[in-house]
Amino acid sequence: MGKFVVLDHPLIQHKLTIIRRKDTGSNEFRRIVGEIGGLMTYEITRDLPLKDVEIETPMGKTVQKEIAGKKLTIVPILRAGIGMLNGVLDMVPSAKIAVIGMYRDEKTLKPHEYFFKAPKDIAERDCLVVDPMLATGGSANDAIAALKKRGVKEINLAVLVAAPEGIKAVQEANPDVDIYAAAEDEKLMDNGYIFPGLGDAGDRLFGTK
């Protein structure tokens, strides 16, 4: 079973409180979602493997450390996942980007994929799927399935808030995927929103509510 980890760093929790407030405007919401994405990436990548490399500083040659292993691809789920993207890229600017477009049927709450674009060598990369909300788990599971269909072996999921129902759905469908969240929220409401949640993260990010 993949692990579920709440990243309870004080800065993450403080910023999460700001974006939970209903009177936080789109500009501030957008900025802080990106900041949380960056802070989460710092924690998620804590155990990346390192290797020794010889470099030359202005003072002479020395052996130092750099990240080893497969290259990283960030996979935002459209549209709300875009809000976390720049913050993640601030931490790993060399990462490539794969984009998955999903929309949720307002009646059935089921996700539908309408777009997929990824680096040609996606099967050789580790992927970090990012989306602010893990509600039913449908979009996350479909995104993970789309990556696995294209040969990706190592996938992690980063979300801001997660409902217990979504956590369970992802763990049951994808027991090899680790989930990282800024918070595990109380429940999934009948309308498909997370409580206490963030509201509609996409609308709040793009000012379309």
Curated annotation (Swiss-Prot):
CDD domains: PRTases_typeI
UniProt EC number: 2.4.2.9
Regulation: Allosterically activated by GTP.
Record key words, sorted: Allosteric enzyme, Glycosyltransferase, GTP-binding, Magnesium, Nucleotide-binding, Transferase
Catalytic activity: UMP + diphosphate = 5-phospho-alpha-D-ribose 1-diphosphate + uracil
Coiled coil: none
Biological process per Gene Ontology, one example term: UMP salvage
Pathway field: Pyrimidine metabolism; UMP biosynthesis via salvage pathway; UMP from uracil: step 1/1
Molecular function terms from GO: GTP binding; magnesium ion binding; uracil phosphoribosyltransferase activity
InterPro entries: PRibTrfase_dom, PRTase-like, Upp_B, UPRTase/APRTase, Ura_phspho_trans
Residues engaged in binding 5-phospho-alpha-D-ribose 1-diphosphate: R79, R104, D131, P132, M133, L134, A135, T136, G137, G138, S139, D200
Cofactor binding annotation: Binds 1 Mg(2+) ion per subunit. The magnesium is bound as Mg-PRPP.
Cysteines paired by S-S bonds: none
Binding site for uracil: I194, G199, D200, A201
Cofactor(s) the protein requires to work: Mg(2+)
Domain of life of the source: Bacteria
Family named by the database record: Belongs to the UPRTase family.
Reported function: Catalyzes the conversion of uracil and 5-phospho-alpha-D-ribose 1-diphosphate (PRPP) to UMP and diphosphate.
Matches recorded under NCBIfam families: PRK00129.1, upp
Protein name, entry field: Uracil phosphoribosyltransferase
Organism: Lactobacillus helveticus (strain DPC 4571)
Biological classification of the source: Bacteria, Bacillati, Bacillota, Bacilli, Lactobacillales
Gene (UniProt): upp
